[in-house]
Amino acid sequence: MTITDLLLILFIAALLAYALYDQFIMPRRNGPTLLSIALLRRGRVDSVIFVGLVAILIYNNVTSHGAQMTTWLLSALALMGFYIFWIRTPRIIFKQRGFFFANVWIEYNRIKEMNLSEDGVLVMQLEQRRLLIRVRNIDDLEKIYKLLIENQ
């Protein structure tokens, strides 16, 4: 097993750990989930570049008669990238004392102000950071508003 294979195994394990954390562990942290809202995906250009580069590496490894283990590991890496970028849906998860946004826990008392832009983006101003929350379904903004009013 080469260093390349070990690095591929490390990256696959990291992506798998992230996927498991995102799907199964994060919704169970910090109490029961009050509301889970699907968000719009950010630009897919990065994901296309990543999966395309891995596909080029697979092609190069196959045509140069490289190790089969490396080909399988590259294929697994491409599948993990495909899952994370195209199948998994980003979510905002509201709990009793705060919410998870982009896998970061934010307590409600950190919100200094909230605004709704004309194009349906909820803007939350924190102490030093601004969150731009783009929901997939515009009706979910009303659910978020009701939940925040109930918990404040």
Swiss-Prot record:
Q: Which Gene Ontology terms of cellular component type are present?
A: plasma membrane
| Residue intervals passing through the bilayer | 6-26, 45-65, 67-87
**Bilayer topology annotation:** Multi-pass membrane protein
Is the keyword Membrane in the record? yes
Subcellular location per the Swiss-Prot or TrEMBL entry: Cell inner membrane
What Pfam families has UniProt attached to this entry?
DUF986
- Which top-level group of life is the source organism from? Bacteria
UniProt main location, coarse = membrane
Q: Which UniProt keywords apply?
A: Cell inner membrane, Cell membrane, Membrane, Transmembrane, Transmembrane helix
Q: Which family does it belong to?
A: Belongs to the UPF0266 family.
Q: What is this protein called?
A: UPF0266 membrane protein YobD
